[in-house]
Amino acid sequence: MESELGFLVSVVIICADITATVLGIEAEIAQSKAPHHHHQQHSRHSGSGCRRSPSDGAFAEGVAAMVLLFIVHVLANVLGGCTYIRSKQDFKRATANKILAVAFLVLSWIFFVVSYSTLMIGTLANSRTNRLCSLPHRWFFLIGGIFCLGHGVVTSAYYVSAIAAKKEDKENAQQENLANRSRA
């Protein structure tokens, strides 16, 4: 039952991150289709100096991609549990699955931060407030979407290795208990 649940969670993680990737790419397309202002006309009507209009579609898809990415990241971290190595001694005793779990956890956070921040910059650039008007608006959604895909793969690998490490820790604890009982 645990292995079936683990497989299901991994599939959900990957599918949700693929969906976030698609949303990021669609947001990039919607942003590129947004009408551009002619600089001279726009500068007469507004002091902001923005050369393009924000895209409502890109904004909505960017928000949806960020929400989905956040939910997947929280889900994987809660279900995967807290996997850590505190000392050199812990590292020497750690199984391969535990070392992999820690490595994938770190990579998962890196992918999350990069994808979330690039999606956020792209989304804010398409908000009605135009606070990020001076930033170049190209490729933020695409980069965020690509990193969402990487996040899905790395986070799924983290979840699988964390569950395997927990199972190994539980089996090792049972064997130690049996060994201690037989000595007594």
From Swiss-Prot:
Pfam families: DUF1218. Disruption phenotype: No visible phenotype. The vcc-3 deal3-1 double mutant shows leaf asymmetry. The vcc-3 deal2-1 deal3-1 triple mutant shows a strong leaf asymmetry. GO terms for biological process: determination of bilateral symmetry; leaf development. Residues 34-53 are annotated as: Disordered. It is a multi-pass membrane protein. It is found in: Endoplasmic reticulum membrane. Keywords: Developmental protein, Endoplasmic reticulum, Glycoprotein, Membrane, Signal, Transmembrane, Transmembrane helix. Glycans are attached at residue 180. Coiled coil: none annotated. The keyword Transmembrane applies. It comes from the Eukaryota. GO terms for cellular component: endoplasmic reticulum membrane. Residues 34-45 have a biased composition (Basic residues). Residues 1-24 form the signal peptide. Mainly expressed in roots, inflorescences and developing leaves, and, at low levels, in mature leaves. The chain crosses the membrane at residues 62-82, 99-119, 140-160. Involved, partially redundantly with VCC/DEAL1 and DEAL2, to ensure bilateral symmetry development and early leaf margin patterning, probably via the regulation of auxin and CUC2 distribution. Belongs to the DESIGUAL family. This is Protein DESIGUAL 3. It comes from Arabidopsis thaliana (Mouse-ear cress).
